Amino acid sequence: MGACGSKGSTSDKGLASDKDGKKAKDRKEAWERIRQAIPREKTAEAKQRRIELFKKFDKNETGKLCYDEVHSGCLEVLKLDEFTPRVRDITKRAFDKARALGSKLENKGSEDFVEFLEFRLMLCYIYDFFELTVMFDEIDASGNMLVDEEELKRAVPKLEAWGAKVEDPAALFKELDKNGTGSVTFDEFAAWASAVKLDADGDPDNVPESA
C-alpha cells in the first residue's frame, strides 16, 4: 500500500457504526467485489481489462480522462458508491496524485488529465485510498472523520490484525496527533498507515508502475 491523504474536509459519515445503513457483512462483500473490479495486476489479462475500462471511462473518446470522467466512471461503471459515500473525496485524491506523478514520467502525461500511461497508477491509488478509508472508518466509531484517543485504544486489536505492533496506545496516539489537537485526522492516519504498511485485506500491492 502507498497513499497519503489531505485533510479530511468531507462531511460524509463513516462506515464504522453502520450510519450509512450497511452492516459489516455488506461492507465485506462490497470490499471483495471492489477488489475484483479494479484491475491492478501486472498481467496481460488485467491490462486488457484496463484498456476496456479506460474506453468506458473515456466518454468523449479523447484518449485522456478529466476528473469528472473518472468520478463518473467510478460511479457508473465500477459502482464504487455501493461501498462508501465518500467516493468523490477518494477519487479526487487518487486522480490528483496519479496525474501529478504521471506528468513527471519522461515528460509525458498531462497536468490536467490522466492518460492511459497513468491509468493503472490511478487505479492503484484508488484502491489504496479505499483501503485506508475502510481502516479509518472502522476506527472512527463516531463517524465525525476524527479519531480521539479512546477510539484509538479500542481499535488496537484491529490495528494489530492489520499488521501494526502497538505496545503503548497512548504513545501511538501522540505520534499520530502531529499538531496536538487531541484528535487524529484521516491525513495523519493515512500517512502513518502507509509508512508502517498496514494491510486490511491481506493483499499487498506491488509498487505502481506504468500501464
UniProtKB/Swiss-Prot annotation:
Positions of Ca(2+) 1 binding: 58, 60, 62, 64, 69
Cell compartments where the protein resides: Cell projection, Cilium, Flagellum
Effect seen on changing residue 98 to S: In strain: PBOL
Biased composition (Basic and acidic residues): 15-29
One GO CC term on file: motile cilium
Domain EF-hand positions: 45-80, 81-116, 127-162, 164-199
Family the UniProt entry places it in: Belongs to the calflagin family.
Domain notes: This protein has four EF-hand domains, three of which may be functional calcium-binding sites.
The name this protein goes by in its record: Flagellar calcium-binding protein
